[in-house]
Amino acid sequence: DSNEFATQIPVFIEKAESRIMKELDDVALDTYTSITFTAGNPVVSLPDGALVVRNVNFTTSASIYGEVQGITPLLQRTYEYAIDYWNKPTSVGTPRYYSRKTNTQIYIVPTPTSTLPGEVQYTKQPLALSSATGTSATTSNYFSENCYNALFNACMIEANYFIKDFQVVQTWEATYKNSIDALRNQARRTRR
């Protein structure tokens, strides 16, 4: 019935946003947050909601040959590489690499000698349009402002799956593919 369909609309939107998030690699979805490397501890907690870690760096004020060194980017490696490269976490040194340890932590090697300020660049999903709390709801987000065609098409795919109109789903899938390809092209151009 129509009430059942209407109650599913927030679910359609949530699924559409999740799909776009997985398929779109746009730096506009990135966030920068300060982190701290703790002396003697190779594990650093990530900010809440970090989906993809793009970059990790630390800052020093050390002077080499009279020049102040600033931001030092770490190179990304696999966790297996990190523990093989620095297999004694109690030994310390200047960090060179980071790896994703869990969904909420990164692993730094060598283990930092001293406490260092750092920064992490990561992809975070915007607040969902379907997240209503009491009388307020998010009325716009990155997807509704910048990816409206892809969002609408993805919602129509979910709606037609719900009503089991599988032939129409194929039409919306093709339209969605065109809109997401255009967004990918736009995102690629911003990284030049």
Segments (PLM) and residue ranges:
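Glycine-enriched, solvent-exposed interface loops adjoining structured elements
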Residues: D1-R192
